[in-house]
Regions:
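Pre-recognition alpha-helix immediately N-terminal to the DNA-recognition helix
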Residues: 20-24, 81
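A short acidic, leucine-rich amphipathic alpha-helix
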Residues: 35-39
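Short alpha-helical segments that sit at the start of domains
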Residues: 1-21
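Amphipathic alpha-helical dimerization/coiled-coil segments
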Residues: 1-5, 80-92
Length: 92
């Protein structure tokens, strides 16, 4: 990972605790947005926006794009790497 990429992704995550919460939720198992929303106490519309941002950054992936109703998401290796990095840098 290059330094510029590192900083932009770390900044993306550091600006939103909810994005970090989504990644943490997906660490345990692959989930649909509704289940992630329950885990992080947010509605599925917001979760879908977080997932789009995380997907664009290649931190999560949709496992079944063709299914319009029950899309399962998974954290990528890149997502795990940056989640760990952000947690280490920003833990009190």
């Amino acid at each position: 990972m290059n330094g510029k990429d590192d900083m932009s992704i770390i900044s993306l995550l550091a600006r939103s605790k909810k994005r970090i919460s989504v990644l943490k939720s997906l660490e345990k198992e692959d989930k649909i947005p509704t289940k992630i929303g329950k885990d992080i106490n947010d509605n599925s519309n917001h979760v879908s926006k977080y997932l789009k941002t995380l997907k664009d950054a290649e931190l999560v992936e949709c496992l079944n794009e063709e299914d319009k109703r029950y899309r399962f998401y998974s954290i990528t290796d890149k997502g795990k790497y940056y989640l760990d990095k952000v947690e280490k840098e920003y833990s009190d």
